[in-house]
UniProtKB/Swiss-Prot annotation:
Amino-acid positions noted as binding heme in the UniProt annotation, renumbered to this chain: 277, 338
Function (record text): Catalyzes the conversion of heme O to heme A by two successive hydroxylations of the methyl group at C8. The first hydroxylation forms heme I, the second hydroxylation results in an unstable dihydroxymethyl group, which spontaneously dehydrates, resulting in the formyl group of heme A.
Membrane topology: Multi-pass membrane protein
Gene Ontology terms: cellular component: plasma membrane
Organism, scientific name: Methylorubrum extorquens (strain PA1) (Methylobacterium extorquens)
Name of the molecule in the record: Heme A synthase
Domain of life: Bacteria
InterPro entries xref list: COX15/CtaA_fam, HemeA_Synthase_type2
Known pathway: Porphyrin-containing compound metabolism; heme A biosynthesis; heme A from heme O: step 1/1
Amino acid sequence: MRLSTHPTLDRFDAVPAASYRPGHGAVRAWLYLLAVLVVAMVAVGGATRLTGSGLSITEWRPVTGVVPPLDAADWAVEFDKYRDTPQYRILNQGIGLDGFKTLYWWEWGHRLLGRIVGLVFFLPFAWFWARGMLGRRLLLGLLGLGLLGGLQGAIGWIMVASGLQPGMTAVAPLKLALHLTTASLILAGLVWLAAGTRPRALAPAPEPVRVVAGLLPALVLVQIWLGGLVAGSKAGLLYNTWPDMDGVLVPPARVLFDKVPFIENFIDNLALVQFNHRLFAYLVVVVAIAHAIQAARTASGSAAAGRAMGLAALATAQMGLGIATLLLHVPLWAGLAHQVFAMAVLIMATVHARLARGVPAATAPTGAEVPIGLEALAGRGA
C-alpha cells in the first residue's frame, strides 16, 4: 500500500479519465511503438555519423531508393557516384568496394528505417481515424507530428546535400543539429500524446512542480541541439579533459570568441561549441536535482515526486556518460550510447511534464458526443 500526503491522487486514479476513448489502449501501444522506432532511428543515425557513412548515398530517391544495389553492375554505379564526392577525394581515396559497401549499408539502413517509421505511422493512423478512435486534440497532434515527420525527411536530405558541396567532407554541423533536434521533437510529441491517453484520471501536481516539470523537456531539447553541434563539428575531440578544458575551467575570451561575425562563434568555434554543451549539461542536472528536491517537499510520496527523482538520476547519469565519452576521445560505442541515452532523458522528462499536468476525471455527458472519422461522414449522409 502506497502512503501519500496527497490522497486525492489515489482517488483520481480509481476513476476513468475524461479524455479516454475506447481503443485508446491500442493507440497508446502504437504511439509507444513509434517512439521505440524513432529511438532506433536516432541510434542508427548516430552510428551512420560516427562511421562516416552518411555521404555514401549521393541521391535522394524516397521511393525507388528502397531497393539497394542487387548485382556487381549496380554496386559499380553507386561506387562511381561516391568517388565523385569531395569526401572520397579528400578522405577516402584508398577505400575499396568492400569498404564502400560497409558505408553504404549504414546509410541505406538509416533511410530504410525512416521509411518503415513512416508506414508504421500513417497506416495505423488512417485505421484509427476511420474507426473514430482519435479524439480531436489527439487527431490534431498526430497530424502535426505527421507533417513534422515529412519535414524531417527533407531536412535529412538537405543535411546530406550540405556534405556533398565542394570542399566538404562531412555534413554541415548546423544542419545535423537541426536533424537530430527535429527527431527529438517528434519523439517528445509521440511520448506526450501517449502519456495523455492514460485510461485512469490523475490529479495535477502542485503548481510549482508543474511549472518546472514543463520547463525540463525544453532544457533537454536545447541540450540535444547543443550536442548535435558538438557531434557535427567533432568538437568533442578538441578538449578531452574534465572538469578543466586543457588546464582551465573557462577558456579565455580570445579562444571562445575569435571569429567574425560574433554569432558564428556559436556554430563554428569548436572551443565555444564544446564549452556551451558542458555548461548547459550542468544547468540541466542542477535544475533536475533541484526539481526532485522541490517535488519531494511539496508532493511527498506522490508519483510526481518519484518521477522527478528518476529524472534527476537519469540526467546525472547522462552527464557522467558524456564525461566518460569525452575522456575516452569519443569511441563509437560511447558516442552512440551518449546519444541514445539523451533520448531516454527526453522521454522521462516529457512523460513527467505531461502527467504533472494531470488527467481530468470523466464526468456525466452534457450533450451528444462529436463524431470523428467515418462516424462523422456517416452522420452527414444520414
